[in-house]
C-alpha cells in the first residue's frame, strides 16, 4: 500500500506526525485540517472480511464496520466493496482528531467533496487548493457559479482562521457562514 512518511532530521522534524499526535507532543496551537473525499481510496479485494480485519486489526471492529457497510449495500457484492472503501487520508485525519480531542486540543476538521467537472476524477488529492486560493479561473475545468460560491467561502474560512484561529465568521455579504 501507499506509505507517506516524513524525513526525520531531529532539527525540524522530530518524529512521524501521527506518533507525535498520539504522544501529545505537538505545539499547543489550534489546527485546521481536512481531506478530499476521493483521494487515496482503499478498496477491498474479493475477501472483504479479511481486508477489513487486516485494516482494523480486530475481528470485532471489522465486523462492526462491515455490518454498517452490508446494511447500506443491501446484498449487492459490488455495492459492498464501494461502501467498504475508505479514503486513507480521511481515516488518519479522523483518528488524529479523536486523539487531539482526548488531549483537549482545539482543531477544525473539514471534508471537501464537491463534484469536480471535467474528467470524472472526483474530489481528488489537491483539488481543494483551487478553491482555497480562489484560483478556479486558472484551471481548464468548466467550473460554474456554485463552484465559485464554494471557493469564496473556503477562502473566507481559511482567512478567518489565519486572522483569528477560528475559521467561522461572515461571508462577503455580511451573512454568517455555516459553522465548522
Task: Show the residue positions of the predicted features.
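Non-catalytic, well-ordered alpha-helical segments in soluble enzyme domains
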Residues: 147-170
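Substrate-gating cap/lid region and adjacent catalytic-acid/histidine neighborhood
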Residues: 1-148
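Mature extracytoplasmic/periplasmic domains
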Residues: 97, 164-180
Amino acid at each position: 500500500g501507499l506509505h507517506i512518511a516524513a524525513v526525520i532530521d531531529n532539527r525540524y522534524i522530530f518524529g512521524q506526525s501521527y506518533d507525535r499526535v498520539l504522544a501529545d507532543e505537538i505545539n499547543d496551537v489550534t489546527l485546521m485540517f481536512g481531506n478530499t473525499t476521493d483521494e487515496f481510496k482503499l478498496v477491498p479485494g474479493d475477501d472483504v472480511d479479511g481486508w477489513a480485519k487486516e485494516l482494523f486489526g480486530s475481528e470485532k471492529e471489522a465486523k462492526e464496520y462491515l455490518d454498517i457497510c452490508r446494511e447500506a449495500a443491501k446484498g449487492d457484492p459490488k455495492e459492498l466493496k464501494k461502501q467498504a472503501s475508505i479514503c486513507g487520508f480521511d481515516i488518519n485525519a479522523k483518528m488524529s482528531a479523536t486523539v487531539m480531542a482526548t488531549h483537549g486540543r482545539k482543531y477544525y476538521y473539514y471534508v471537501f467533496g464537491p463534484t469536480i467537472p471535467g474528467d470524472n476524477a472526483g474530489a481528488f488529492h489537491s483539488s481543494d487548493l483551487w478553491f482555497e486560493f480562489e484560483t478556479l479561473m486558472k484551471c481548464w475545468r468548466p467550473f460554474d457559479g456554485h463552484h465559485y460560491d464554494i471557493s469564496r467561502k473556503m477562502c473566507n474560512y481559511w482567512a478567518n482562521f489565519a486572522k483569528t484561529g477560528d475559521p467561522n465568521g461572515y461571508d462577503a455579504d455580511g451573512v454568517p457562514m455555516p459553522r465548522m
